[in-house]
Amino acid sequence: MKIKEKATPRKNENVKITTEFIRLDAFLKFKGIAETGGQAKTFIQDGIVKVNGEVCTARGKKIHAGDTVSIFSVDYKIITDEN
């Protein structure tokens, strides 16, 4: 018997930043994904956060315009006024 796994549809959301970059842990708090810095750290260290399609375990990773942060079936595209 074969079991078919349904793929969870991914959501896409643009997130506008007004600075040159935002740290990954600060981004998770900014979007309300993590309630505290400790929770953001846990999400990142547990490997459930991807940056541009690759697992990122560096909580101080600088996220720039054009980057995509993925967590919990949502892809957040970082944008600025310039793009």
List the predicted regions and their residue ranges:
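Short, structured beta-strand/loop micro-motifs enriched in basic residues and often containing a Trp
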Residues: 47-54
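Beta-rich strand-turn-strand
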Residues: 36-38
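Residues that recognize and position ribonucleotide moieties
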Residues: 20, 42, 49
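Short, well-ordered loop/turn sites that connect or cap secondary structure elements
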Residues: 34, 43-44, 63
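Ferredoxin-like alpha/beta domains used as RNA- or RNAP-binding modules
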Residues: 1-31, 55-83
